[in-house]
Structure formats: structure tokens, C-alpha cells
Amino acid sequence: MTTNYIFVTGGVVSSLGKGIAAASLAAILEARGLNVTIMKLDPYINVDPGTMSPTQHGEVFVTEDGAETDLDLGHYERFIRTKMTRRNNFTTGRIYSEVLRKERRGDYLGATIQVIPHITNAIKERIIEGGEGHDVVLVEIGGTVGDIESLPFLEAIRQMAVDVGREHTLYMHLTLVPYLAAAGEVKTKPTQHSVKELLSIGIQPDVLICRSDRAVPANERAKIALFCNVPEKAVISLKDVDSIYKIPGLLKSQGLDDYICKRFSLTCPEANLAEWEQVLYEESNPGGEVTIGMIGKYVELPDAYKSVIEALKHGGLKNRLTVNIKLIDSQDVETRGEEMLKELDAILIPGGFGYRGVEGKVLAARYAREHNIPYLGICLGMQVALMEFARNVAGMENANSTEFVPDCKYPVVALITEWRDEDGNVEIRTEESDLGGTMRVGGQQCHLTEGSLVRQMYGEPTIVERHRHRYEVNNMLLKQIEAAGLRVAGRSADNKLVEIIELPDHPWFVACQFHPEFTSTPRDGHPLFAGFVKAAGDYQKRQVK
């Protein structure tokens, strides 16, 4: 099998949506029967995003095999069926770490280690390794052309055309085509200069994606084609849209997939986008709306909860409901109390780290429990629900987690010091372990309790969901909590770790230690989010009555 590579770069400004554009193109190519995957190359020095602030970098997306990756990989999995792995994302930091490790071992036999060829070779090796077994690999280069940090990656992808053949490489460049109200027209000069910058590196783009708040007129696209040495049919207008799931259709309508298939000499049927048309139909024809409050500590940057937000929308699609998400700072709940939680049809508490805002989350969990409001707790959201129940129902005064109060009397949540990974190897963690790369992370089996609400929603006895945490329910105190009315609805494969809890006497109160948002997609949804949004709609109807 010959693998073809599409390298996606961005120019003029950041945040043009390279990841969405790449994922949308991948969705069309997949719909043509091609085996497609997507990679993200990040130019920052961090080894991975695992220890980066969510308010700076957004969420950390966890893959099935336990890699902590860029949030763009979440977009990739929501658009295509291929599951991402640790091969699909790497950073400058990881590349340099590997090269330096080899140098220390003496692998380079005393050679002077340089960016070219050692760093660029390592990058190319990673790209080729990640693309094995696929017809087409889309490779998104993080950052903006012109950034110093991106230069080794750009040089590596320039060399790829030499290594694998120009006929198997395509360069797709996203640029901004701004509209100037004073002039009453779009301006192409920024795009021309961005392409000039790319040419100075040795890369001639084959496709230009022109991002604008409106459709770029044909005459302006012809002008861009002339000055940038790109065929007119390869200059694509990509305007702002109210739903990212419209983008595959927009790209297909301009023949981008046909152009690429011809460029790679690929013979494949026309793309069938019926599934995406169904998603858009469900999105544009809701039967009602619900308001769900998300109580978090990183709410100033919604991207910190990107997959949760998307999963809630997917749950809305499956119930033909528009989901209005109200982001609420958990510290505001601490200071202003229950007034922050009124007018909500459901409450969701997502994952997080650190004690700041935790008591606000505990208060929100109590409010949901006492007022029969649907509640979904994820990761830390399960732990605070357990703390709240232990304190106010099970009689464990000031019950807490050892993450926040190490010497508390009732440590209902405690550090996992030992477990087995997916290969059966024993993992050991202590308070002294590094923060990076030391969590229980990735896909883990969970056995669902017969007769539980979650068993009913999933429709099967065993599931696999993705984790990212260090702390777990303390089994030593579990019997007292269960005796007070809490039900364990799911356990780990070895039956030692509590994965899901429910309140049988509550209309819909579910909390899980894993992150179900990472496996939700617009086409398939997710059982927990579909059930949660349905419960929000049912609660709203009860309130009206």
C-alpha cells in the first residue's frame, strides 16, 4: 500500500480552524471508502499537554491507548471513524527528548546533533510511522507559518516530498481573507504574503483554503490563484458557519475531494454524506430546548471543556433538543450559593484538579440531589458527589478527598497507589510521583451492575471508557456509604475500583470516574449524554406541570 500525505498549514493569524478543516476533509475522503487518519504536530516544548493549564491550552484529549493529546484529536475522532492513538500527536518537546536520549546512549556514534538532519529525520520517522496502513494521512502543523517554533516541522514536511515523492504529497494552506467594511471588499494581500512566506521555506501550496466571514467571490479566488501559483479549482472558499458539521458539505460542493483524489491518482466512489446530512437535519429541527449548567473551574475558556460541550450537543441531537449550556464558575457557587443554580434543567460537574472551587461543586451536587434535578458527574464530578453524599446522608462529617485534605477523618476519595494497566503490568504511584504521565489514563473495562440505570442505557454488561485521574473511591469506607442508599453501578475489570455510582431514589443521578465525553460523536452520540439530556427534558416537563 502506498500512503499519501496531506500537510495542513496555517497563515496570517492563528485560530483559523486548521483542525476542523482537516477533520472535515478527512470525513469526505473516508466517505469515499478511503482509510484515513489525521496527525497533529505541535511546536511547543512541552512533552505533551498533560501538565499544561486548561485555561491556556484547552482540554487534554485522552486516546484509547492512554495518550494525553491536543484537543484537535477530539475533533478528528468526532469527524472520522478511525480512533486516534499516541502516534497521532507529538510535540517539539517529545522529538527533542527522544533525540537527546539517543545521543546520550551513543546511538549517533559521536556525530554533532543538529536540527537538520537529526530533528527533521525524527519528525519524518514519526509521520511515516503514524501513517502506516492508511491510504491518506492528513498532518496538521500547529502554529502559524512564520513562527520560529514551527520551522523544524515545516522543513521536515518539505523533505517528505523528496522522500516519498511529490506525487504522494499535497500541501494545503489555510489563510485569512479579511473583509474590510470601509472598502466593501475582501482583501487578498495577506494570503499572498503568507504564501510568499511558505515559498521562502521551500513549500509551494497545492490547495488554498480561504477563511473569511463570507464567501470569497470567484474573481478574488482567481486573483489568489494567479498570484499564488495555484489552480483556480484548488482555491477553496470556507466561510464562517453556524455549525462545524456543515463544513464537509461545503468542501465537497467545491470539489476539493475530487481534486485531491485525482492528484493522488486514487480511484474511489463518490462520497456519501447522508450521515452528516442527518446530523444537520437533527441539529436544525429540534423539538425543544433545555438548559444545562456546567459547574467548573476553567469556565473562562470554554475549550477547557470542549469534548463535554460537544457531547452535550450530541445528546441533544439524539433527543431532538437544543442544549443551552450555562458555564458557571464553581467559586461563584461558593460565594453566591443556590441562586446560581436556579432555572437549570440539569447539572453537570466535569473533571478538574485542585481544591479551588471544590466546595462550590459539592454544593451543586447537593442541590441536584435534594431537588431531584438530573445530575451527571464526570471524574472529579463523581468524587464531589460522593463527598456530598457521605457528608449529608451517610453521616460522615467533613468527608473529603486526600487530594484536598490529606489527614481528613473520612477520606472517601484517596490516591491510587497501585493498579494494573491494559497489558497487566503493575503501575505504582505515590505523592512523590511526577505530575506528568503518571495517571490512570486511557481505555479501561468496566462491568455494569445488573438492574442499574447505566446498564439499561448502555444496553450491555461490559463497556470500555477512557480515564484520566489519580484518585479513586476509598473502598474501606464504601460499605457505610452504600448502606445509606448509594449504589455502585459499575466496577473495574478486576472488581476493585468503583467506576460509576447512582442514586436509586433519584430520577436521574449518575456519576462516573471515567470521561465519557471522549467517545461521543455527532453521528452516534453517547448513552450517558443521550440519557442525561433526555432526563433534563423530562425534568423540564415535570416543572411545567
Curated annotation (Swiss-Prot):
InterPro entries: Class_I_gatase-like, CTP_synthase, CTP_synthase_N, GATASE, GATase1_CTP_Synthase, P-loop_NTPase. CTP binds at residues 14, 147-149, 187-192, 223. CDD domains: CTPS_N (cd03113), GATase1_CTP_Synthase (cd01746). The keyword Nucleotide-binding applies. PANTHER family: CTP SYNTHASE (PTHR11550), CTP SYNTHASE-RELATED (PTHR11550:SF0). Belongs to the CTP synthase family. This is CTP synthase. It comes from Yersinia pestis. The gene is pyrG.
